[in-house]
From Swiss-Prot:
This is Siderophore iron transporter mirA. GO terms for biological process: iron ion transport; transmembrane transport. Gene3D superfamilies: MFS general substrate transporter like domains. Involved in the transport of siderophore enterobactin and so has a role in iron homeostasis. It comes from Emericella nidulans (strain FGSC A4 / ATCC 38163 / CBS 112.46 / NRRL 194 / M139). It holds the Pfam family MFS_1.
């Protein structure tokens, strides 16, 4: 692919091509308070115009290197968690670490998007890498569960920030027709080797060193691997400041006067630009809503009977509604502009993400346990089956991106992906309990999971580009954060529902079907797959255990398929976004009417590549 494809501005469309007339930019005087570009967005816009071919080559090389190191760190450090658990001898407390990490990741998306819009993309890369390095350093030196959880908070913020800023950076420097390609390549080319080689690295580290060094080494490796990306961005950012500013930036006020007192500057930064009150409402609302969902996950569904959990859930919803009201009517620089929420493409894409990740979590939480107990697979094959969805997703994302590039439309790939997800889940529903004690083999499960992964790769890649195309350039980071957060929220809810179904289904079935002499072991068998696997395959006890696992996993599969079914209707609400010069110009300048006027008499010319 030619490097010209990376350019955010259609080649020749804004400057030299007489057939495509540049629309008048929207100046601050023409914008509402919420539409005025924030400092970080202005900086990103000036940087976008200042990139050279050589600079983009170096920047994307650095992006691939940084992404590779972060993905290797993520997948290899998962191996060390049981060792940390054993060191603290507080296995039950580790679930609290997962809860805090999940909540932190979801809440971090909109906060990081806002910080990126205020301070800039390079600055957010730096902040994210620092947070992740500090998190790994705390992991390496932690002496108790509290410190381990603190490390998890830093690591969660860092990894979430890097992933989001990576996608926003790609959106900044690509036009719509090439965006899907470049947004999928960094992860697609690095996740697959990290997925399989990360565990090999972890095992090699454990042979010669303890788990603490396994965490700590990434606090060194990741910042080093990120120097090329961050250094290149800072260099071109500094160079862009020295160049004459384009008219649309030169004429815009800086949102504050240099003669203002320090307290006015602090007020403008904290209250207006960062919307501190909105941030507090958002964090409180999400935390109160997600804590009970997370704590009632795979093993504590009985806690729903506690009044405090219901109260937290209700209060969280109320505060989140208050946040939406504040953002809509009061905030000058809202986290989520109201016009974005009411856009049907954005709303539909977020609903697709919520339902898809709800289905995935409902089915997958206990799937590897089911594979090892009822399907008699070892831990290795069970992991390979589960990972097949991730691999298929990454590969399909690349193909979907290129298909979008050549068809110059997004909706058709949503229409392709969603039915594939439903089909794959339908096959899984059949495979988990085929009747007469039969279940699918490894190849069948891999095929079904791969169908879901391919479907997700198609619809999610197309949906992300679609939602980014429906907002102005200054709102790309926010809409991307909302899109990712919606998927995470769906996953959190799905985990809780899976725990409730599993806990209400498996124990009664075990108590009912186990041989009389083993009925008192029902709770022990439910609580540990190790205990369940101790019973020899083919014995009455193991046959009863296998049947109970099959029936319980089938219930989860039914719930997952039911969640996917509405997606077949929701997908029609996404607009068919044309990936053309005209759409790119609208995104760049936010002046839809001027662009339409300049392109009257026919569709805009397609972006050149």
């Amino acid at each position: 692919m030619a490097l010209d494809d990376i350019s955010a501005v259609p080649k020749g469309a804004l400057d030299t091509d007489p057939a495509v007339e540049r629309p008048p930019p929207l100046l601050d005087a023409d914008r509402s308070d919420s539409e005025r570009l924030q400092p970080g967005v202005k900086r990103a816009e000036m940087l976008r115009k200042g990139w050279t071919r050589q600079g983009l080559i170096i920047a994307f090389t650095g992006l691939f290197l940084a992404t590779l190191s972060i993905n290797f760190g993520d997948y290899s450090t998962q191996v060390y968690v049981p060792y940390a658990t054993s060191a603290f001898k507080q296995h039950s407390a580790m679930s609290a670490a997962r809860v805090v990490g999940n909540i932190t990741r979801i809440a971090a998306y909109p906060i990081i998007a806002k910080l990126g819009d205020v301070f800039g993309r390079a600055e957010m890369f730096i902040l994210s890498i620092v947070f992740q390095a500090v998190g790994y350093a705390i992991y390496a030196g932690c002496k108790n569960v509290g410190q381990y959880i603190a490390g998890g908070i830093f690591e969660a913020i860092g990894s979430t920030g890097f992933g989001l800023t990576q996608q926003v950076f790609v959106a900044d420097v690509t036009n719509l027709i090439n965006r899907a390609v470049w947004s999928t390549l960094p992860d697609s080319l690095t996740v697959i080797p990290a997925l399989y080689l990360g565990t090999e690295i972890a095992e090699a580290v454990l042979e010669k060193n303890e788990w603490r060094w396994g965490f700590g080494m990434w606090a060194i490796i990741e910042p080093v691997c990120s120097v090329l990306l961050v250094g290149t961005m800072l260099y071109y950012q500094k160079r862009a400041r020295k160049d004459p500013s384009p008219a649309e930036f030169a004429s815009e006020p800086t949102e504050r006067n240099v003669d203002d007192g320090w307290w006015k500057r602090i007020y403008n930064l904290v209250w207006v630009q960062l919307d501190a009150f909105g941030a507090i409402l958002l964090l409180l609302g999400l935390s109160l809503f997600l804590v009970p969902l997370s704590l009632t996950g795979s093993g504590n569904s009985d806690d729903w009977h506690r009044g405090s959990f219901i109260a937290m859930l209700v209060l969280g919803v109320v505060i989140f509604v208050a946040f939406l009201a504040w953002d809509t009517w009061c905030a000058k620089k809202p986290f989520i502009p109201y016009r974005m929420i009411k856009n049907r493409t954005v709303a539909a894409a977020c609903l697709l993400g919520i339902l898809d990740f709800f289905h995935y979590s409902v089915f997958s939480v206990f799937f590897t346990s089911y594979l090892q107990v009822a399907a008699h697979h070892g831990a290795g094959p069970a992991t390979r089956i589960d990972n097949s969805l991730r691999v298929a997703f990454q590969v399909a994302g690349i193909f979907a991106a290129y298909f979008m590039k050549f068809t110059k439309r997004s909706q058709v790939w949503v229409f392709t992906g969603v039915p594939l997800c439903v089909l794959g889940m339908g096959v899984l529903l059949y495979l988990v309990d085929m009747g007469e004690g039969r279940v699918g083999n490894e190849a069948a499960f891999v095929t079904a999971k791969s169908l879901i992964g391919i479907g997700r790769g198609f619809y999610q890649t197309a949906s992300q580009v679609s939602v980014q195309a429906k907002v102005s350039r200054g709102e790309v980071s926010v809409v991307t954060a909302v899109f990712f957060a919606a998927m995470s929220i769906g996953g959190a809810i799905g985990t809780s529902v899976a725990g409730a179904i599993w806990r209400s289904t498996l124990p009664p079935k075990l108590a009912q079907h186990l041989p009389a002499e083993l009925k008192d072991q029902a709770q022990a068998i439910f609580g540990s797959i190790v205990v369940a696997q101790k019973y020899e395959v083919g014995t009455p006890a193991r046959d009863a255990i296998d049947m109970c696992y099959r029936q319980s996993q089938r219930m989860l599969a039914i719930a997952a398929l039911a969640a996917l079914a509405p997606m077949l209707i929701i997908m029609f609400f996404l607009e068919n976004v044309p990936l053309t010069d005209e759409t790119t110009l609208i995104e760049l300048h936010g002046n839809r009417e001027a662009v339409k006027k300049n392109h009257s008499g026919g569709e805009g010319k397609e972006a050149r590549s």
